[in-house]
Amino acid sequence: MHCVQYQAGRCHSCQWLSIPYSRQLEDKQRHLSALLSGHSVAQWLSAQPSAELAMRNKAKMVVSGSVERPLLGMLQRDGSGVDLCDCPLYPDSFAVVFAALKSFIPRAGLTPYSVARRRGELKYLLLTESRLNGEMMLRFVLRSETKLAQLRQALPWLQAQLPQLAVISVNIQPVHMAILEGEREIFLTSQQVLSESFNGVPLYIRPQSFFQTNPAVAQALYAQARDWVQALGVTEMWDLFCGVGGFGLHCATPEMTLTGIEISAGAIACARRSAAQLGLTKVSFAALDSGAFADAHSAVPQLVLVNPPRRGIGAALCDYMNRMAPPYILYSSCNAQSMVQDIERLADYRIEKVRLFDMFPHTAHYEVLTLLVRASA
């Protein structure tokens, strides 16, 4: 993949861009194998590759420059802005949106936020696209509501230019820190979710709810989880850290009792909507802390699926799972190091299957799916 910004030394987000893609995949597989070298793995599956460019469905653009000439991209260490509208990770459909936004920002008088001076209003633009129908969600991250009325007044022009913007919102992030978003979301459109579909499973994307940024690889990841779970023939499972329900809804059958737990109420609303659309009557989702939920329930499901943040599930939840002793644990991780730490805590489980998914090409990061089986199962 050729990138002008990388070649010019202005952006190094894709640290491995100079490495041929086939070798990137080999290096990631070697890294994962080394991390698990102290464990017996019954079956290694071949790594799931990614497209090398235009694979992302989301852009997180720092807004810098001036209101007359905004830059959309990132900040360098010296505080100067780098425009990344030509980033080859984004699909072609993003280019027209970025161009229109550069005209809209001065129309609406949205002064870019200056980190050095702690002045200005517009901090980020967050763009997400649905592969299902091409609809997009655009979020303006503002320091305050000072420019909200101006934004509303100018918005019809933007909507006329970009009818694909089905969901538009403002997020208020008042803190002078490198925090992407605040708690308050103000919708500027009647539609508040994007519709998506992976492997025939309807999914919904809301502001502030996690959704994978590489949809083709995410689709393969969910399909692999479904195939492994269905081969086990389980009829009761928990989906902890479930997000919008991608894993659980892929694994669920009409006969299965599935409980999905996620801290985000918005994500749970999306998961419930998907379950209703699929006609799954034995599926329930609740907005709770996953660890607290597990600790409060004495019933033991046949399988627990976990998809935690980078820190992993941690010692407390591992200890609980050892005591609860479900026959199977399906662990999806975006940080193999924390996953291996958790596996070492799950002393009563052996590793049955492992597969790497290259969710983040041109970087050292990857996703991994691991099936753990209780030694006595």
Swiss-Prot record:
Binding site for S-adenosyl-L-methionine: Q212, F241, E262, N307
Known function: Catalyzes the formation of 5-methyl-uridine at position 747 (m5U747) in 23S rRNA.
Reaction equation(s) it catalyzes: uridine(747) in 23S rRNA + S-adenosyl-L-methionine = 5-methyluridine(747) in 23S rRNA + S-adenosyl-L-homocysteine + H(+)
Residues that hold [4Fe-4S] cluster according to the record: C3, C11, C14, C87
GO biological process: rRNA base methylation
InterPro entries: 23SrRNA_MeTrfase_RlmC, MeTrfase_TrmA_AS, MeTrfase_TrmA_CS, SAM-dependent_MTases_sf, U5_MeTrfase_fam
PANTHER family, per the entry: RNA M5U METHYLTRANSFERASE (PTHR11061), TRNA (URACIL(54)-C(5))-METHYLTRANSFERASE (PTHR11061:SF30)
Entry EC no(s): 2.1.1.189
Keyword line: 4Fe-4S, Iron, Iron-sulfur, Metal-binding, Methyltransferase, rRNA processing, S-adenosyl-L-methionine, Transferase
Entry-linked NCBIfam families: meth_trns_rumB, rumA
Active-site residues annotated for this sequence: C334 (nucleophile)
Family: Belongs to the class I-like SAM-binding methyltransferase superfamily. RNA M5U methyltransferase family. RlmC subfamily.
Keyword Cell division in annotation: no
Gene Ontology MF terms: 4 iron, 4 sulfur cluster binding; iron ion binding; rRNA (uridine-C5-)-methyltransferase activity
One Pfam family it belongs to: tRNA_U5-meth_tr
Domain of life: Bacteria
Enzyme class, spelled out: transferase
Protein name (record): 23S rRNA (uracil(747)-C(5))-methyltransferase RlmC
PROSITE patterns, per database record: SAM_MT_RNA_M5U, TRMA_1, TRMA_2
